Amino acid sequence: MSAANMPTTTGAQGSGNQVPTTSTTIVNHFRELIKEPKNLDEAANYLFQTLLDDAVVGIFNETHHLRKSGNLAALDGVPEDSTYRMCEMPNLDIFGISTAKKPMDCTCPNCDRLVAAARFAPHLEKCMGMGRISSRIASRRLATKEGATSAHLHSSGNTGGTDDEDDVDWSSDKRRKKSNQNSRNNGSKKNNGKTF
């Protein structure tokens, strides 16, 4: 069915009944009314009434369809009043979020001690033995343990030794010597200690 032949309902002039018509019928009836100059008021009223009826019936049908399909509530959306309400409860801010201080302590998974949140990462590093200082202590412990083991093996008369014991300890030769305080420039190369 084309748009020109779509059935619409119109109210007959002077009577209260609704007559289903098509748009071509409406246009033909309007042209007949315009032919005579004395019927122009009737033609204007007829055209207005037809357009109004068509718009009202269209809105009614669409609303009825949305209500029956359950989509009418989705068309309305969420009411805006609830988003701008202020909360006036004690210990809550205007958005309803608690203002009470939260405990800032963490429990260490390794030793089950309560540690302040700001100190948790350094504590966990030391507690698990993974920090920089812990690795240095572990290296020293291994070096002293190896030294005691090799001294024990040499004193017992075993001269065979393993390949690990024969290797040169590379880390002991590269230990950094402390610099003398007088030889430092404190970061400035200016004047080199000379006065002019």
Swiss-Prot record:
GO terms for cellular component: cytoplasm; DUBm complex; nuclear pore; nucleoplasm; SAGA complex. InterPro entries: SAGA_su_Sgf11, SGF11. The keyword Cytoplasm applies. It comes from Drosophila simulans (Fruit fly). Gene3D superfamilies: Classic Zinc Finger (3.30.160.60). Belongs to the SGF11 family. The keyword Zinc-finger applies. Residues 180-196 have a biased composition (Low complexity). The modification Phosphoserine is found at residue 172. GO terms for biological process: chromatin organization; mRNA export from nucleus; positive regulation of DNA-templated transcription; protein transport; regulation of transcription by RNA polymerase II. It comes from the Eukaryota. Component of some SAGA transcription coactivator-HAT complexes, at least composed of Ada2b, not/nonstop, Pcaf/Gcn5, Sgf11 and Spt3. Within the SAGA complex, Sgf11, e(y)2, and not/nonstop form an additional subcomplex of SAGA called the DUB module (deubiquitination module). Interacts directly with not/nonstop. Interacts with the AMEX complex component xmas-2. Interacts with Cbp80; important for promoter recruitment of Sgf11 that is not associated with the DUB module. Pfam families: Sgf11. It is found in: Nucleus, Nucleoplasm; Cytoplasm. Residues 1-22, 141-196 are annotated as: Disordered. This is SAGA-associated factor 11 homolog. The long N-terminal helix forms part of the 'assembly lobe' of the SAGA deubiquitination module. A zinc finger (SGF11-type) spans 106-127. GO terms for molecular function: transcription coactivator activity; zinc ion binding. Component of the transcription regulatory histone acetylation (HAT) complex SAGA, a multiprotein complex that activates transcription by remodeling chromatin and mediating histone acetylation and deubiquitination. Within the SAGA complex, participates in a subcomplex that specifically deubiquitinates histone H2B. The SAGA complex is recruited to specific gene promoters by activators, where it is required for transcription. Required for nuclear receptor-mediated transactivation. Binds independently on SAGA to promoters in an RNA-dependent manner. Keywords: Activator, Chromatin regulator, Cytoplasm, Metal-binding, mRNA transport, Nucleus, Phosphoprotein, Protein transport, Transcription, Transcription regulation, Translocation, Transport, Zinc, Zinc-finger.
